[in-house]
UniProtKB/Swiss-Prot annotation:
The active site is at E49, D60. The lineage of its organism: Bacteria, Pseudomonadati, Pseudomonadota, Gammaproteobacteria, Pseudomonadales. One of its GO terms (molecular function) is tryptophan synthase activity. This is Tryptophan synthase alpha chain. It comes from the Bacteria.
Length: 268
């Protein structure tokens, strides 16, 4: 079993959802970002999504757009992001780590080279937000052939006719974007989330993670009662933006992760 399969199976036995945390590689700088990354599992993160900085993150709201700018201004590249995963893996062989971002940097890096290096450093999955199922041959199938999960996004506007196409070839888990729009937007109602999870379960046996708009331990707990995973990104990245310095940013992100983890663990 893959690290993602193992983690979700373990949490199912514990009857709780996974806390999935998103941070951008290189934000606020390389050293602080690596410190955050290494600290997240102990703070309660069950799965980590690591953003690959890009100049035009069109699906992301202001918080993550600014995180991309901070990281790129600090010299973060795709090669340095893969190096960061390697350094993380040297001390953690169990926590699943998923790279999330856009196809353009991967295309410029070289798809074959990227997949080979991602596999070597210990990447477990990919979320590439601007690569629809019609382009599975470009990255999804080669990644899966190398043993890297390809995680699909579904949204409130993904209809029942489209869902099987989106889910075909998906692996690891399904990421349900609970608000149609950019990351960090207002949260969806719990009733809406419950209906969406039920609809997705009719189409897939994969674990379902819910993201976009989750900002507090209480909200994370409420979503954790409905889904297999609770994804939090913008709320963590806001802590970096508001911190007085990078050392404070590390502390604040890990503190919020701890609060969210407590909410998720006490949800059921």
């Amino acid at each position: 079993m893959s690290r993602l399969q193992t983690r979700f199976a373990q949490l199912k036995q514990e009857n709780r959802a996974a806390l999935v945390t998103f941070v951008t590689a290189g934000d606020p700088d390389y050293a602080s970002s690596l410190e955050i990354l290494k600290g997240l599992p102990a703070a309660g993160a069950d799965v980590i999504e690591l953003g690959m900085p890009f100049t035009d993150p069109m699906a992301d709201g202001p918080a993550i757009q600014l995180a991309n700018i901070r990281a790129l201004d600090g010299g973060q590249t795709l090669a340095r992001t893969l190096q960061m995963v390697r350094e993380f893996r040297s001390g953690d062989s169990e926590t699943p780590l998923v790279l999330m971002g856009y196809f353009n940097p991967i295309h410029h890096y070289g798809v074959e080279r990227f997949i080979a290096e991602a596999k070597e450093v210990g990447v477990d999955g990919l979320i590439v937000v601007d690569l629809p199922p019609e382009h599975n041959e470009d990255l999804c199938h080669p990644a899966q052939a190398a043993g890297i999960d390809f995680i699909r996004l579904t949204t409130p506007t993904t209809g029942d006719q489209r869902l099987p196409t989106v889910l075909e070839g998906s692996s690891g888990f399904v990421y349900y974007v609970s608000v149609a729009g950019v990351t960090g937007a207002n949260a969806a109602t719990l009733e809406h989330v419950e209906e969406a999870v039920a609809r997705l379960r009719r189409h897939t046996d994969l674990p379902i993670g819910i993201g976009f708009g989750i900002r507090s331990a209480e909200h994370a707990a409420a979503v954790a009662r409905l889904a297999d995973g609770v994804v939090v990104g913008s709320a963590l990245i806001d802590r970096i933006a508001k911190a007085r310095d990078n050392a404070q940013a590390v502390k604040d992100v890990l503190a919020l992760c701890g609060e969210l983890a407590e909410g998720v663990r006490n949800a059921r």
